[in-house]
Amino acid sequence: MVFESELLLQRRLATTALKQPKELGYYSTNVGGELKVMDESNLSYYYLPDADIEKHIDLSAGARKFQDEQAEAEDDTGSLHGLLQTLMEYERRKSKKVNADIIAFRGQVKRLIHCAFGGHATDVDMYVMSFDGQLFIRAARKKLEFPTSPRESWAYLAYYSGYKFERMALLDRPVAETPREVLESRGKQVVRNGPQYKTVVRTGVGEHKLVLGAEVDGIFDFREPTGDNLKHYVELKVAKKVQTLKDATNFEQKLFSVWLQCFLVGINRVIIGFRDEKFVLKSVEEFSTSEIPLLLKSTGLRNACVDAIKWYGALTKWLCELPRGPEDDFKLYRLSCSRGALHLRQLHDEDLANGDDIIPGWFREWRRSLSKSHGS
């Protein structure tokens, strides 16, 4: 008999109790599979003075030379390997298994929440594996979808402008360590999106704990070499300058989306660059993640943030009701969204369950050795 379960999208948990996110580790990754745990070499630093903003930066400049390494690479963009390597290093330091119910990337959890607030149902297509008393979630697709339109098209320039803004607003090193010629030539540098820096955070809602991996755009002020840097991270976004009612509605939706993205892992600061129809940067504004729900109070999304937390609690509780057996009791499920509900269906795919696509062999062996060391 095949196990199946569903959760209606209008379901909500009464509680909005949240656990304070805490950084467990971080890693740097490049296209091609290069990955360095507890390494900040790909961490960037925010620096965009008013004098630069006043130059009306063209966020479409250089699109033809854009090195879209993520789109061109053959990498498995849904792989949990970097997250699990960082988690393994954390467990090695602590000599114990991390206390968590769900392990996933922020992007997957965001999709699960967003599907109840106008997100595309097709965005929810995931595998859930029960292993060692925990649930591991990854995207079913190994490759993200990237724009296929011509580089001079509006759709492609809208996609590119976000990366261009990051290139103009971020430095590879703190500004005090950056040569003047580098600062002055940022506008001429070719934009590329291969190198990434990711944080691994433990958080929770209601009675359940999650470990989430998430890409970080950069540091806003300074980095603490031995501390938790969540309070120093910043998220960058580009939005169209608000001039019409439609612009305002779109911006409110974007604010809700970025709040959800940052709230999930405890990033406290958002910087949004406002552009015109020709992708010229007109202004830059800083937002506190905690203040965004207050800003949305006077809009059509007045209750969206609290409602999202209640839905987050409901879906997490539902997932954690899945049977979670001992170390070698693997159970595999497909998670999807359709007809106003989330659906879980058990799979009997031994190749997928025993392969490295979801939980690699080296992580399974690590957990076995950890279990034996505690049992001896």
Curated annotation (Swiss-Prot):
GO cellular component, one term: nucleus
Catalytic activities: a 5'-end NAD(+)-phospho-ribonucleoside in mRNA + H2O = a 5'-end phospho-ribonucleoside in mRNA + NAD(+) + H(+); a 5'-end (N(7)-methyl 5'-triphosphoguanosine)-ribonucleoside-ribonucleotide in mRNA + H2O = a (N(7)-methyl 5'-triphosphoguanosine)-nucleoside + a 5'-end phospho-ribonucleoside in mRNA + H(+); a 5'-end triphospho-ribonucleoside in mRNA + H2O = a 5'-end phospho-ribonucleoside in mRNA + diphosphate + H(+)
Biological process annotations from GO: mRNA processing; NAD-cap decapping; nuclear-transcribed mRNA catabolic process
Cofactor requirements of the protein: a divalent metal cation
Domain of life: Eukaryota
EC number: 3.6.1.-, 3.1.13.-
Any one GO MF annotation of this record: metal ion binding
Protein keywords: Exonuclease, Hydrolase, Metal-binding, mRNA processing, Nuclease, Nucleotide-binding, Nucleus, RNA-binding
Any matching Pfam family: RAI1
Binding residues annotated for a divalent metal cation, in chain numbering: E166, D217, E235, L236
Record note on cofactor: Divalent metal cation.
Primary location recorded for the protein, binned into one broad class: nucleus
Signal peptide coordinates: none
Subunit (UniProt): Interacts with RAT1; the interaction is direct, stabilizes RAT1 protein structure and stimulates its exoribonuclease activity. The interaction also stimulates RAI1 pyrophosphohydrolase activity, probably by recruiting it to mRNA substrates.
Function: Decapping enzyme for NAD-capped RNAs: specifically hydrolyzes the nicotinamide adenine dinucleotide (NAD) cap from a subset of RNAs by removing the entire NAD moiety from the 5'-end of an NAD-capped RNA. The NAD-cap is present at the 5'-end of some RNAs and snoRNAs. In contrast to the canonical 5'-end N7 methylguanosine (m7G) cap, the NAD cap promotes mRNA decay. Also acts as a non-canonical decapping enzyme that removes the entire cap structure of m7G capped or incompletely capped RNAs and mediates their subsequent degradation.
Similarity comment text for this entry: Belongs to the DXO/Dom3Z family.
Protein name: Decapping nuclease RAI1
Species per Swiss-Prot/TrEMBL record: Eremothecium gossypii (strain ATCC 10895 / CBS 109.51 / FGSC 9923 / NRRL Y-1056) (Yeast)
